């Protein structure tokens, strides 16, 4: 075929495939794909839309920044190996793993870095990744801020009060209500080691998920607004300890969750995918 149009099993595979097709070692081909997968993310200073040239030989891989104000350095190229990786030294593919633990980086010109030492470790069998997601419901989002120290100290009680008001309206099932407390544990949740040391200000994001937009909006609105009226010990007022940057809650994209995250061993990886050859043009 002169032109191939298809999906990709990984970003790196798009660039590794032609190198493998022309007989280059998988050790270098897969690293070539890895370094080129996000264009100039492997260069500095940052410029995500710029171009990088990758060169492969029997001995090494070389990455050169094409923009005159960018350069591929030892730090930028090796740092890109950590991109979207829980382990910066390895990346898994359908038929094996790229081991980067022994990579050596050499600055051979101002804009070019040379890479050696990568190893591709093939698996005995090819594994095809299966991923799936399912829609949970429609979603609305609301925001509020808290500056009052007493309310910050009792923010869980404030959230609990709001949840009870939603429960009084909708019961306990048929919707989801989520609170992210930024300034305390909004990013890491229960894994946050400094959860007992909140900041002097908190931002709370409220997400309501329900089968319909109307219900999701109301769940979110009640879950947000009722924080304003939360009853706390030692507070004589009836409202006012929460500030709202917006008058409304905002319609967001639908909520989805993972339903499938698996790999399946296959004897022939192409058996799962249809291939069509079409003659185009005159």
Where are these regions (language model features)?
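Short hydrophobic alpha-helical module
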Residues: 7, 38, 165-169
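Short Gly/Thr/Asp-enriched flexible loops that form oxyanion-binding sites at enzyme active sites
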Residues: 10-23
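A mobile, often basic/glycine-rich helix-loop segment
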Residues: 26
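C-terminal non-catalytic interaction/assembly regions of soluble proteins
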Residues: 124-282
């Amino acid at each position: 075929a002169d032109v191939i149009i298809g999906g990709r099993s990984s970003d790196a595979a798009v660039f590794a495939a032609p190198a493998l097709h022309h007989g280059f070692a998988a050790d270098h081909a897969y690293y070539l794909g890895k370094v080129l997968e996000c264009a100039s993310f492997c260069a500095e200073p940052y410029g995500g839309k710029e171009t990088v040239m990758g060169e492969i030989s029997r001995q090494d891989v070389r990455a050169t920044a094409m923009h005159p104000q960018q350069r591929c350095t030892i730090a930028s190229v090796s740092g890109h190996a950590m991109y979207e990786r829980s382990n910066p030294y390895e990346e898994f593919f359908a038929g094996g793993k790229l081991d980067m633990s022994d990579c050596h980086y050499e600055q051979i010109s101002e804009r070019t870095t040379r890479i050696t030492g990568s190893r591709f470790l093939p698996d005995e069998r090819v594994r095809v990744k299966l991923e799936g997601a399912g829609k949970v419901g429609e979603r609305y989002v609301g925001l509020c801020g808290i500056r009052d120290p007493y309310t910050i100290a009792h923010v869980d009680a404030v959230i609990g009060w709001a949840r009870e008001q939603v429960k009084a309206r909708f019961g306990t099932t048929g919707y989801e209500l989520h609170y992210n407390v930024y300034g305390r544990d909004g990013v890491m949740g229960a894994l946050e080691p400094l959860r007992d040391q909140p900041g002097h200000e908190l931002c709370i994001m409220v997400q309501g998920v329900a089968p319909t937009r109307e219900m999701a909006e109301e769940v979110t609105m009640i879950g947000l607004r009722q924080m304003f009226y939360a009853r706390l010990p030692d507070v004589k007022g009836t409202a006012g300890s929460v500030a709202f940057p917006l008058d409304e809650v905002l319609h967001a994209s639908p909520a989805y969750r993972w339903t499938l995250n698996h790999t399946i061993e296959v004897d022939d990886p192409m058996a799962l995918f249809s291939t069509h050859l079409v003659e185009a043009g005159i």
